[in-house]
Amino acid sequence: MKHAKTSITDVPGPALSRRQVLRHLVGAGVVLPWAGMLPIGTGFAQSPRTSSAPAGARIGTVTNLSVEDDQFLDDVEKASFQFFWEQGSPNTGMVKDRCNLRNPNQLSAASIAATGFGLTALCIGDQRKYVPAGAALERVFATLRFLWKKLPNHRGFFFHFANSETGERMYDSEVSSVDTAILLCGLITCREHFRHPAVAELANLILNRVDWSWLAEDTSLLTHGWTPEVGFLPSRWDYYSELMMLYLLAMGATHNPLPENTWNAWKRLIFEYDGMRYIGSFAPLFVHQYSQAWFDFRNKRDKFADYFQNSMTATEVHRRFCLELNKQFPDYSEELWGITASDSQHGYVVWGGPPAMGPIDGSVVPSAAGGSLPFLPAETLRVLKTMRSKYPSSWTKYGFVNAFNPLKNWYDSDVIGIDTGIILLMAENLRT
């Protein structure tokens, strides 16, 4: 089957995120090869792992980290933290969307999602003593004051991209629901970590300003966003993806919350691969990672699934999918696998699988394994350690590059905030 080409090098403007790319593809009528997807259902009685995983499936095989593995993860966390510390503005706390390693001081737009990861990174840096005592808290105060008083918002939701010093909207970007949610997750993490009355006051002011009911347009489903030029975006958060954090925040809000039945309103599509069934989505592996970076779904389930087990299954499926590609791309192996939305040699690509999505070319994306550390600890640790030892050009002062291709000897010159952030958070989640 010919794969749908999802590179966006021909799409004007630098501000397209992975969600915007997916919206662009759908709007352009691109047909994605979703073979293997089962009909929409209302869930299943057992978790995907216990109901469908074949005997011997190696899922979640590490319970205790060795001293060596813990030190390796600390190296990863400390390097990743440096991105947020150095690429975050000391004046505003806004974190650059990406950084070119060849010219790290060049001007770049900040993203509210990277800033949300950055707020969480400050908690980790404070706990791990990556910065002097009090330094992280000072940066948190600067960020929260800027978010409350100066960063433009609409009904409490923030524009996706902004000037890191002035807060001015950039690239005609949208007021983004999911990116605001990531920012709020970082905000709540700071409130709970520092337990400082002034931090809590600012955090609650920002949280209570968000009008969730407005963005739902009197329905149960949130839109992807809004712009002053066109109003609400047509896409809605209506099927499984990184949306879980959105709806948990919205239903738990003190002001303008969404009703509890919102949780049952979005669809859960059932996929099957190699005898394993799981709830999946029209998107790469990152959708199984983001909500679980902040919300602990372990040993919990609703009437549909155990979502932690579901992400474990989805990650194992992705690992097997990559190994199946070994004949085409011999570098893919038990020691090196993982594809999710990332840079490529020819531009930004939303790729992954199964089913195969995007023009897969042998590239490896560190955040695929790094963002899945709690789900397959042994397998993902093996991959990350292989990257650093056998592919030293994949390792930088900010941790791993965004992507690299061993077959073509190509290494990205950029680090992207949200991808470095998910590695940092999931490494910390595995350790603690």
What role is predicted for each listed range?
Residues 1-20, 27-33, 42-44:
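N-terminal secretory signal peptides
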Residues 7-9, 48, 53-56:
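Compositionally biased non-globular segments, especially hydrophobic aliphatic-rich helices
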Residues 22, 54-432:
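Ser/Thr/Asn(+Pro)-rich, low-complexity disordered segments
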Residues 31-32, 37, 193, 301:
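Hydrophobic alpha-helical segments
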Residues 37-52:
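Signal peptide processing junction and immediate N-terminal pro/mature segment
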